Amino acid sequence: MGKIIGIDLGTTNSCVAVMEGNQVKVIENSEGARTTPSIIAYMDDNEVLVGAPAKRQSVTNPKNTLFAVKRLIGRRFEEKEVQKDIGLMPYSIIKADNGDAWVEAHGQKLAPPQVSAEVLRKMKKTAEDYLGEPVTEAVITVPAYFNDSQRQATKDAGRIAGLEVKRIINEPTAAALAFGLDKAEKGDRKIAVYDLGGGTFDVSIIEIADVDGEKQFEVLSTNGDTFLGGEDFDQRIIDYIIGEFKKEQGVDLSKDVLALQRLKEAAEKAKIELSSSQQTEINLPYITADASGPKHLNLKITRAKLEALVEDLVERTIEPCRIAIKDAGVKVSDIDDVILVGGQTRMPKVQEKVKEFFGKEPRRDVNPDEAVAVGAAIQGQVLSGDRKDVLLLDVTPLSLGIETLGGVMTKMISKNTTIPTKHSQVYSTADDNQSAVTIKVYQGEREMAAGNKLLGEFNLEGIPPAPRGVPQIEVTFDIDANGILHVGAKDKATGKENKITIKANSGLSEAEIDQMIKDAEANAAEDHKLRELADSRNQGDALVHSTKKALSEYGDKLDAGEKEKIEAALKSLEDVLKDTSADKAAIDAKVEELGKASQKLGEKMYADMQAQAGAAGAAGAAEGAAQGGAQQAADDVVDAEFKEVKKD
C-alpha cells in the first residue's frame, strides 16, 4: 500500500508533506520551493500552468490567471462574499446553471473544485517525484469553519485530481497535531490555534492529553470567518495606492486589469517587507498612460500606515477568539500555548493583538506555512495504521438542523459536537392527510431557518393518510469524520425511508465529476506528450551544438564526403527544430540520422584524445624519472600535512 500524503490546500499557497518513519518530510516542488502558489493559468495553446510559472505570467495574462479560488469553493453565486469578490478579481466569476459561483478562463466555464484540482494534481506529482512511486491517497485540510458544501467541494477537487481523499481535516487541528507531537511535555495542555491564512480565518481551542501513552487531541471549540485573510489585507493596500494615484495623477487604475495585477503583486511585496522594516517604497514605472504620455507610480508606505489601513481586519479576528474561549468552557488564563498558523500571522500588528488578547507571547517554534501540511501527513500515517499513538477528536463547526413549522430552525446537532456523531429525532406532519414531507437541512446559528445556509432538501413520500401530528417520522443526522453530513428520514409506521448524503441544490453531480476526471486524465496525457516533445527538442538542440563544436575542431580530419553528409544531417535537424508543428517522431528521426552521420567524426575525436593521452603519459614518465632523482636529495626534509582553515 502506498503512502497517504498530507496536503494543505491553501488560498494563497499550498504545501505537501509525507511521513517517513517518525520523521515528517515537507516536499520541495519541481521549482525547489516547499510551498506552491495556489495560482492556475490557462494559456492560449490549452496548456495549464500551476504555481510559480503561473504567478510569473499573471501580469500579462490577468483574465486567465486564477488565484484565491478557495474563497469560491462550495459557494453560491448570490452570496454577498462572492458578490464582493466579483468587483475585485481581474478574472470573471460567473453564475453556473445550478446557481454556484464558477469562474471563466478563455471562454471556458470552470467549477472551483476543477480549478483547485490542478493545484492538488501538482501536489500529487510533487510527492510522486520524491517518493518514486504512484500516490493515490491523501488527507486534505480545510478551514475549520468551512461548511458542509465547502467540505464536499474540496473532496470533489481531490477526486478530480485522481486522489482518494481518506480524510478532510481542519487546518487548526492539523497544526495542533504538528505542534503536539513535536513536544516532549507530558500532562494535559490547552492550546489555542490562531490561523490567519490567505483567505480564511480560524481559531480552535484544543486540549492535548496523555492517555495511556497515547496523545489525544480533543478540539473543545472552533470559530472563524471563511472570508477574511491575507488577500483582504492586500486589497486594503491596493485601494490605498489607487486612491493616492488618483489624487496625484487624476487617473483611476481600478479599471485597468493589467495595472491591477501589477498592483496586487506590489501590495503583497510591500506587506511582506513591512513585517520586518518600518517603511517600504512601491515603484511601478509605466503603470498606465494617458494623452500626456506614460505615468509612473512611486509611493512610500510606512508600517504605521499599513496598520491603520488594516486595523479593523485585525480586530475582526478577536471576536471569534472570544466566542471560541466561551464555547470551550475555559478562561483565557487556562490556555497554555498560543500557536500562530498562516502567513498573515507574520505581521507584527497581528502578533501584538493576539498577545494582548491571550495575555501571553505566541509560540515562535511552529512554521506557519508548513505546520498544517505536516499535521495532515501525521493524520495520513494514523489512517494507514502505521501510527497508533495518536487519537484525534474533532468537532463540527456549525449547528445542523431542519426547518420546522413557521420557518424555525430546529437544531439536531449543536456546534462544537465531537465527530463522528449521530442524532435522531421524531417529527410529525403539519396537515391532516399529508402524504409527503419535505425535509430541508440547514447549517448555522440563526433561530430562523432562512438566516442559515440551506445544505439541501429531500422528500419522504407515501405516508398513509392520518390526522396531523399522528404520523411518526424519524429524522437521523449522521456526521462522518470528514465533517460531511448524511441524513435519513423514516416513516415509523410503514418503514419507508429515504437517505441522502447532503448534496445541496448546488455542488457538482456525479456525472460532472466523472467528466472532469476524464478531462483531467486527457490533459495529463497531453501534458506528458508535451513534456516528451520538449525533451526531444532539448536533445536535438544539444546535439546540434555539440556536432557544430566537434566539426569546427575535427572537421578537417574528415574527407569531403563524410563532412558533407554530417552538414546535410545537421541542417535537416536544425530545420525540423525550427518547425513549431514538428512532432516528437520527426525530431527523433533527424536526431538518429545525425547521430549515424557523425559516427566517423566521433571515431576521429576518440583517436585524437587517445593520442593526446599517450603523449601526456610519455611526458609524465620522463618527468617522474627526473623527480625521482630530486627526491633522493630531499629525503632529510620533514613531511608535514597542511589543512585549509575556512573562515566563516
From Swiss-Prot:
CDD domains: ASKHA_NBD_HSP70_DnaK-like (cd10234)
UniProt cross-references to PROSITE patterns, sorted A to Z: HSP70_1, HSP70_2, HSP70_3
Stretches for region Disordered: 612-631
GO molecular function per UniProt: ATP binding; ATP-dependent protein folding chaperone; unfolded protein binding
Organism listed in the record: Burkholderia multivorans (strain ATCC 17616 / 249)
Record has Endoplasmic reticulum as a keyword: no
Keyword tags: ATP-binding, Chaperone, Nucleotide-binding, Phosphoprotein, Stress response
The protein's name in its UniProt record: Chaperone protein DnaK
Gene: dnaK
Keyword Plastid: no
Modified residues (Phosphothreonine): 200
